[in-house]
């Protein structure tokens, strides 16, 4: 009996100590938070935090929240603190003033599966590995010289697309689908050395890319990560990566054994960099595959979506279309196709693309960054480990920066003061600083040449007598924000 009483006393003592410690820790946590000057936060719910306030179009929902809480907000997505920047001033503080502190990326169980433990360039955490890999990619794959070297690929695939559009005369053509095929063909050829026709690769690519659109519970509520297993998300991601890995392994092995000839592609360049002993940076095939995944994931959607929105705006604004056609026609001087060398002279073309990117940035919420240390940001205390999203869609429509911000007016860029390099914080569709997209120049080369040739060769209209002002511009959120419905047009040869 004495032993039982002793055990009960011990248990009561432990329980009392635990409860006391719990309340002490809660008090310390509360006191610590009250001493910090945190950014304004919308009311959150237990477990899910502010997820219920994001809706199907988070960039628009966050704009509405910022109108109430201000240009810098602290949300909680599950257990993840997420800072949201909604104007150019806050964006500049994050991506310039405190760029080093916000140069890392958050970790994610699903991204670890899709990108070999985030060994790619887009999602790798900041550090020596990321710096070395970025240097290799920028100097070997995406330099101006290399971008120019793929001119023949761009011309060939755009010429093929123009032929398909021409054959559609008398019926409507699905411009959106054509542009996805164009982007796939260009990027496959540049990355892998050849175009892989057939439904198998197309299906594999689209299944892989679709994984980035799916919500991973474990990424935001770690103790509920079993939900990803139960829902099949983890299994699906593992399966599609295994299929893609097997496909890429064959291609890489063929390159390594010189079975594929016909010029240097991205895999050749990465294999050469892997064998280069002078860099002092050793990496395995998983890195090569992760980089190729990046190129597919970041390139196909952003290129096709960018062109799709430009063509939509041109069809909706025939006066802009005519002005652009005039410029392209005068500079091309009767040639059968627009030459890439002439693109630099087409300043209105560049203005049209910039204006479309202002209204329709491919990624309206830049890939989240993560703070590596405590930061004092515009008077607020930001703790290490806080994730950061920049709403570039909202910045592009800020009425304090842009006159009539919802109107499509390319003339606002006619002076050429804003370039693709991302140094203007009122216009940053591809980010700025250490984490700016390194492939902007590569993508722009495809986008400019494709648009110039489409408007040079064809007059476009909406089918079935639909008026241009009635074109549906609804959007759908995904890897990129693309058209909700495909762009269907009729194309008439101009000459």
From Swiss-Prot:
TM region positions: 4-24, 208-228
UniProt-annotated binding residues for heme: 437
GO CC terms of this entry: membrane
Source species, domain of life: Eukaryota
MF (Gene Ontology): heme binding; iron ion binding; monooxygenase activity; oxidoreductase activity, acting on paired donors, with incorporation or reduction of molecular oxygen
Cofactor(s) required for function per UniProt: heme
Membrane topology: Multi-pass membrane protein
Glycosites: 419
Protein's pathway: Secondary metabolite biosynthesis; terpenoid biosynthesis
Pfam family, one: p450
Subcellular location: Membrane
Primary residence: membrane
Amino-acid biosynthesis recorded as keyword: no
GO biological processes: sesquiterpene biosynthetic process; terpenoid biosynthetic process
Keyword terms of this UniProt record: Glycoprotein, Heme, Iron, Membrane, Metal-binding, Monooxygenase, Oxidoreductase, Transmembrane, Transmembrane helix
Keyword Iron: yes
Function statement: Probably involved in the biosynthesis of germacrene-derived sesquiterpene lactones.
Assigned protein family: Belongs to the cytochrome P450 family.
Protein name according to UniProt: Cytochrome P450 Tp4149
Species in which this protein is naturally found: Tanacetum parthenium
């Amino acid at each position: 009996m004495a032993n039982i009483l002793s055990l009960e006393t011990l248990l009561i003592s432990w329980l009392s100590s635990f409860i006391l410690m719990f309340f002490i820790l809660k008090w310390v946590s509360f006191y610590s938070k009250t001493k910090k000057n945190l950014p304004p936060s919308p009311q959150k719910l237990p477990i899910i935090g502010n997820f219920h306030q994001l809706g199907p179009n988070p960039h628009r929902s966050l704009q509405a929240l910022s109108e109430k809480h201000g240009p810098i907000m602290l949300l909680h997505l599950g257990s993840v603190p997420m800072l949201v920047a909604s104007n150019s001033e806050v964006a500049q503080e994050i991506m310039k003033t405190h760029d080093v502190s916000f140069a890392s990326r958050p970790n994610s169980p699903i991204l670890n599966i899709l990108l070999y433990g985030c060994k790619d360039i887009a999602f790798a955490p900041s550090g020596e590995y990321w710096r070395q890999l970025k240097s290799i990619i920028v100097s070997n794959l995406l330099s101006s010289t290399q971008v120019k070297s793929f001119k023949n690929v761009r011309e060939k695939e755009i010429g093929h697309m123009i032929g398909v559009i021409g054959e559609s005369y008398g019926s409507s053509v699905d411009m959106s689908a054509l542009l996805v095929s164009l982007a796939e063909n260009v990027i496959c050829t540049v990355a892998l050395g050849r175009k892989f026709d057939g439904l198998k690769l197309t299906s594999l690519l689209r299944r892989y890319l679709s994984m980035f659109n799916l919500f991973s519970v474990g990424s935001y509520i770690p103790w509920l990560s079993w939900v990803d297993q139960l829902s099949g998300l983890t299994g699906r991601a593992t399966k599609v990566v295994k299929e893609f890995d097997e496909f890429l392994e064959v291609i890489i092995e063929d390159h390594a054994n010189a079975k594929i000839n016909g010029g240097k592609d991205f895999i050749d360049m990465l294999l050469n960099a892997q064998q280069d002993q002078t860099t002092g940076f050793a990496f395995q095939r998983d890195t090569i595959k992760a980089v190729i995944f990046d190129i597919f994931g970041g390139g196909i959607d952003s290129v096709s979506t960018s062109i799709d929105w430009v063509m939509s705006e041109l069809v909706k604004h025939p006066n802009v279309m005519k002005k652009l056609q005039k410029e392209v026609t005068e500079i091309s001087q009767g040639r059968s196709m627009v030459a890439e060398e002439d693109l630099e002279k087409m300043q209105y073309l560049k203005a049209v693309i910039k204006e479309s990117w202002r209204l329709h940035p491919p990624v309206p919420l830049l890939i989240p960054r993560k703070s590596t240390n405590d930061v004092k940001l515009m008077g607020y205390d930001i703790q290490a480990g806080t994730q950061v999203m920049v709403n570039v869609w909202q910045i592009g429509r800020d009425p304090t920066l842009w006159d009539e911000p919802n109107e499509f007016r390319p003339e606002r860029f006619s002076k050429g003061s804003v370039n693709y390099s991302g140094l203007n914080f009122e216009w940053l569709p591809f980010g700025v600083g250490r984490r700016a997209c390194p492939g902007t120049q590569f993508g722009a080369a495809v986008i400019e040449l494709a648009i110039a040739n489409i408007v040079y060769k064809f007059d476009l209209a909406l089918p079935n007598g639909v008026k241009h002002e009635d074109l549906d511009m609804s959007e759908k959120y995904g890897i990129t924000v693309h058209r909700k419905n495909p762009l269907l047009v009729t194309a008439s040869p101009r000459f």
